[in-house]
Design a protein with these regions (language model features):
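Active-site-proximal cofactor/substrate-binding loop regions of enzyme domains
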Residues: 1-20
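Conserved acetyl-CoA-binding loop-helix of GNAT-fold acetyltransferases
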Residues: 15, 21-37, 180, 186-199
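Acyl-donor-binding surface of acyltransferase catalytic domains
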Residues: 30-105
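Short glycine/proline-centered loop/turn elements that form peptide/ligand docking sites
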Residues: 194, 215-218
Length: 223
């Protein structure tokens, strides 16, 4: 279990190929369900325990038998998840995004690196807007003294309204999460943060960016 008392996860499960179709997987899942139920869990998610998952979900193309198995066990597919990557060699922020950033700044937005004084506010912001997992990502970066280097924030009227970060699992190339408060979405702020993060990574000699999970709207945004 994580920060949600009524939610549990099955992060990883394998059965040796030679021992499949003997009911082993069924027994393991039933045992896990029994233990989680005893702890008060009301729903179980497969794999997607951010940020410490091996996979963001079951690979539909790679493991069709696993899909069939879990559907037979009563599990339902809820949403699709995509892994994506980008080459950052010779990256330069496009002029259109530079102009958008300047226009946003004229209306009161301020972009910059995380500072220690932002700690309590950004943790509360992340929890309220996106959930405990995002708060944990930030907290871990603070604990190892890397938040100033890996977190970019955007403020409006001196209050944090969005942020982007990287390296949540120790890999300098891993991007995310990135998010903007509900009141300020659809204003291009997320796009500005993403472009800034790419520019920052390239300037630090990090020439490859990847993330392991996003949904359909996220995929359209990054494409």
């Amino acid at each position: 279990r994580g920060l949600e008392p009524d939610r549990g996860w099955i992060n990883l499960m394998f059965v040796r190929k030679a021992n499949r179709r003997q009911g082993i997987a069924k027994m393991m899942v039933e045992e896990i369900e029994h233990r989680l139920c005893a702890l008060g869990v009301k729903r179980i998610t497969l794999a997607a325990y951010s940020p410490n998952y091996f996979f963001p979900g079951i690979d539909v193309e790679g493991y069709p038998e696993a899909i069939f198995f879990f559907e037979h066990m009563g599990y339902e597919g809820i949403e699709s998840s995509y892994s994506m990557s980008k080459d950052l060699h010779d990256y330069h922020m496009p002029e259109t995004w530079i102009s958008k950033k300047e226009e946003a700044e004229k209306t009161g937005f301020r972009f910059g690196s995380f500072e220690g004084k932002d700690a309590l506010e950004i943790l509360e912001f992340a929890k309220n807007e996106f959930g405990g997992g995002w708060k944990r990502n930030l907290l871990m970066a603070m604990r190892v003294g890397e938040a100033e280097d890996v977190v970019t924030v955007v403020k409006y009227q001196d209050h944090i309204v969005g942020f982007a970060m990287r390296k949540i699992d120790g890999n300098v190339m891993r991007f995310g999460p990135i998010g903007v408060g509900r009141k300020f979405r659809d204003a291009g702020i997320g796009g500005i943060l993403f472009e800034m993060k790419q520019q920052e990574m390239c300037s630090k000699g990090i020439y490859h960016l990847f993330f392991v999970s996003t949904d359909d709207p996220g995929r359209r945004f990054y494409e």
